[in-house]
Each structure stands twice: as C-alpha cells, then as structure tokens.
C-alpha cells in the first residue's frame, strides 16, 4: 500500500520503542510516521485518561496529527499497581525490586497494557486503542535493555518478552494488540483521515 504524503508524529524519545512500533505497523501503514521527543508532564489517573490528556497536550505542541502511547504493567496481587507508574517503579527499584514487590504474595500474575491515543490535531476528537496481554512476573531473564521485558512472561510461553523472537513478541504483545486495533481504525477511516490530514 502506498503511503500518503501526510505524516503523523509519534511522540517518543525512545529509539527502541519507535523501532518496535515501526516493525509492528509494517509497510502497509498508509501514513508516514515521524517521531519527536516532547517532555510531557507525568500525569496521574486512570490509564485511558492519561493517554487522552497526553495526546491532547502533544497535539497542541506539534500543532498537527499525533500518536502517543502509555504502557502499564499491572500486578493482580497489588490491584493493578504499578500500572501506568511502571517506568518510575522500574527506575527506582530495578528488575529485582519489581519481583520483590510480589515477594509476600503467592499470586505472581500480571498483565501488560498498552494504550495508543491518536488525534488529527489540536481540538480534534481523540481515539484510544487498548491492547492487553496476560502473564506473570518472573526473575529477570534475557537482555535488560528494554524496560521491564525481562520480568514479564506472557501466558502460554516459557520465555520472557526479552527472550522472545521479536516477530513472535510483536504478534502477541500488548503493544502489538493496541496497534492492531489502531490499524483497523485507520483502514476503516482511511479516506476520511487522508482528507483531514491533508488539510
């Protein structure tokens, strides 16, 4: 599928995340994807509300179409914590600390959730796309250069995200599922979006 000249800014300064998103979207994504690092405030609240507000703020900064992503890692024994605050928890405690949070609990189950939010520009409607993968928290295994991937083992697999072949991971991951929903929306609304993004 040929790409239109319209570009969507994916707000991230994380090169690995950008690479993974580009791999998942593939050549069939109808719009050019650029990226930009914007220092958005660390918001508190429910994950979908955080994504919407980040998208609104990013669109105002970029003055055009944007995509933002918010990722949560939710421990069932802790009623969903760390949730959207996982980046802060990981920075402060490391992989061992994440495991230690569950040391007193027999339930190590967790789910990874990704919410992409998209808007065509400032003041326009914001669409959200939620992807979720169930799994469990395990001692870190595999490369440690991509967030909490080494401690999350998805249900039905013996490997952590960090140990998995990237193609397999992208096909079952929370991010892959969220982007699949986003792509379905873009396919359904392609003509309408092309007009809005060309304006």
From Swiss-Prot:
Where, in this chain's numbering, is ITP bound?
A: 12-17, 54, 70-71, 87, 146-149, 169, 174-175
Instruction: List, alphabetically, the CDD domains matched.
Output: HAM1
Keyword set, alphabetical order: Cytoplasm, Hydrolase, Magnesium, Manganese, Metal-binding, Nucleotide metabolism, Nucleotide-binding
Question: Which Gene Ontology biological process is one annotated for this entry?
Answer: deoxyribonucleoside triphosphate catabolic process
Question: Which prosthetic group or cofactor does it need?
Answer: Mg(2+); Mn(2+)
For molecular function, the Gene Ontology terms on record are: dITP diphosphatase activity; ITP diphosphatase activity; metal ion binding; nucleoside triphosphate diphosphatase activity; nucleotide binding; XTP diphosphatase activity
- State what this protein does: Pyrophosphatase that hydrolyzes non-canonical purine nucleotides such as inosine triphosphate (ITP), deoxyinosine triphosphate (dITP) or xanthosine 5'-triphosphate (XTP) to their respective monophosphate derivatives. The enzyme does not distinguish between the deoxy- and ribose forms. Probably excludes non-canonical purines from RNA and DNA precursor pools, thus preventing their incorporation into RNA and DNA and avoiding chromosomal lesions.
HAMAP family assigned: HAM1_NTPase
Q: What is this protein called?
A: Inosine triphosphate pyrophosphatase
Please give the organism.
Monosiga brevicollis (Choanoflagellate)
């Amino acid at each position: 599928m040929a790409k239109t000249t319209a570009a969507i800014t994916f707000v991230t300064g994380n090169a690995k995340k950008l690479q993974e998103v580009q791999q998942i979207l593939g050549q069939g994504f109808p719009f050019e994807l650029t990226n930009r690092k914007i220092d958005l405030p660390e918001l508190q609240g429910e994950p979908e509300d955080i994504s919407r507000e980040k998208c609104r703020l990013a669109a105002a900064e970029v003055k055009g179409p944007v995509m933002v992503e918010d990722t949560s890692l939710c421990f069932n024994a802790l009623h969903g914590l760390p949730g959207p605050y996982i980046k802060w928890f990981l920075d402060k405690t490391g992989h061992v600390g994440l495991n230690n949070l569950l040391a007193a609990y027999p339930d190590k189950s967790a789910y990874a959730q990704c919410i992409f939010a998209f808007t065509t520009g400032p003041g326009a409607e914001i669409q959200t796309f939620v992807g979720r993968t169930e799994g469990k928290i395990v001692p870190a295994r595999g490369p440690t250069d991509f967030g909490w991937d080494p401690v999350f083992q998805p249900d039905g697999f013996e490997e952590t995200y960090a140990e998995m072949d990237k193609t397999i991971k992208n096909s079952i991951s929370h991010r892959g599922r969220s982007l699949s929903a986003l792509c379905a929306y873009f396919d359904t609304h392609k003509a309408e979006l092309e007009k809005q993004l060309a304006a």
